Design a protein with these regions (language model features):
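Juxta-kinase regulatory segment immediately upstream of eukaryotic protein kinase catalytic domains
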Residues: 1-41
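Active-site acidic catalytic loop and adjacent metal/ATP-binding pocket
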Residues: 45-56, 61, 201-253
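Conserved hydrophobic "DFG−1" position in protein kinase catalytic cores
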Residues: 53-56, 69, 105, 122, ...
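Active-site ExK catalytic segment of metal-dependent nucleases
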Residues: 64-73, 121, 242-244
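A conserved alpha-helical element in kinase catalytic cores
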Residues: 66-115, 130-143
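A cross-family kinase active-site recognition segment
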Residues: 101, 105-107, 130-191, 211-213, ...
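Conserved short submotifs of the Hanks-type protein kinase catalytic core
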Residues: 113-126
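Active-site activation/catalytic loop segments of kinase-like enzymes and analogous catalytic loops
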Residues: 252-287, 301-330
């Protein structure tokens, strides 16, 4: 969230202290185009990043910017790679919005530190998480499709996906959690997980044979996108932020991840189906879609659903947990051919 609600940075906050100490070096690295920086702490921030407001002046034109440091290698590389485009504020109706922020400058070092940093266009939007509507959800999914298109165009060599998670271990702990946490419908849960465990080798064999056809965002949730409503000739649009978990994979991973966040609360999707809409948006952009997509999505849904008891208390509520159980019971029948 590039321009969220903020509070002044606490003087004892280590990232901000380091950022202030490095501010003169950062301004010098930007060749005098960056103004003095007002450091702040954003409500959405996780981890040890410092963030600041400033202005970037070039050819007599000043633009509000956000400075972020330190930035990890994956986020730095991809944000810079995809941020070489025009300003969001210049996008007009009829044009395709940029899926990620404009990057004015970036680097992997600052002074004597190996420390990644970014200077980004400041966006006047709200996080989709705090602005849920049909238009913001659609904008998020369109931005994901455009991200898929631009990322594969900029780096066609996908390489290998991350190693498969230890699903067998996760599901074993899920069964223990069902008992220890006295999860409602415990007998149904135990039976559902048992069925998944029995089919797991076949499901994983199918999953691991999936086509690797995109760079997945990896963390596609409403807190990682800004929504800018359309006005004054600008289109309604969303911009994705936090590109730290990008990885090679199959596009259904992003779709199902977003979808599963709303299990038990589908009303907050306003009738929008993330899998169906993302598939449609990818197809419209000439990106790979296939007949196996639904089956792969169902496998991913089952894997996530059977893991829910393992992470009880970390995410979800009773409606979410109940919906996850229903997913397993419904989808395992559809996957019985595996």
């Amino acid at each position: 969230m590039i321009t969220p609600e903020t509070r002044p940075a606490d003087s004892g906050d280590d990232p901000s202290t380091l950022a202030r100490a490095l501010e003169p070096v950062l301004i010098e690295a930007c060749q005098g185009k960056l103004s003095d920086i007002e450091w702040f702490h954003a409500d959405w921030q996780r981890g040890g990043a410092a963030t600041g407001h400033a202005k970037w002046t070039e050819n007599g034109n000043a633009c509000p910017v956000i400075i972020k440091l330190p930035v990890g290698g994956i986020e730095l590389s991809w944000t810079a790679r995809l941020g070489d485009h025009g300003l969001d504020r210049d996008v007009r109706v009829g044009q395709t919005p940029h899926p990620t922020p404009r990057v004015f400058h970036s680097g992997a070092e600052l002074g004597e530190y190996d420390l990644g940093w970014l200077v980004l266009e400041s966006l006047e939007g709200k996080a989709v998480a705090g602005d849920l509507s049909a238009s913001s959800v659609k904008g998020l999914i369109r931005a994901a499709a455009e991200f898929h298109a631009r990322s594969i165009a900029s780096r066609p060599d996908l390489g290998s996906p991350p190693a498969t998670r230890d699903w067998a271990g996760i599901f074993a702990r899920s069964r223990v959690s069902v008992k220890e946490n006295r999860i409602p419908d415990s007998q149904r849960w135990n039976e559902a997980i048992r069925v998944v465990q029995k089919a797991l080798p076949r499901m994983l064999a199918r999953w691991e044979a999936r086509p690797i056809n995109t760079w997945c965002h990896g963390d596609l949730h409403p807190g990682n996108a800004l929504h800018m409503p359309g006005d004054d000739g600008h289109p309604d649009r969303c911009v994705l932020i936090d590109l730290a978990l990008i990885h090679a994979g199959h596009w259904v991973e992003d779709a199902v991840y977003l979808e599963h966040l709303f299990w038990g609360h589908q009303d907050r999707l306003f009738g929008i189906k993330p899998f169906s809409m993302l598939r449609k948006e990818r197809k419209a952009r000439g990106l790979d879609v296939g007949e196996q997509d639904t089956e792969l999505a169902n496998i991913k849904r089952v894997l996530l659903a059977a893991a829910v008891p393992r992470f009880i208390g970390v995410e979800g509520d009773q409606k979410y947990v109940a919906a996850a159980l229903e997913k397993i019971e419904t989808l395992m029948g559809q996957l019985s051919h595996l």
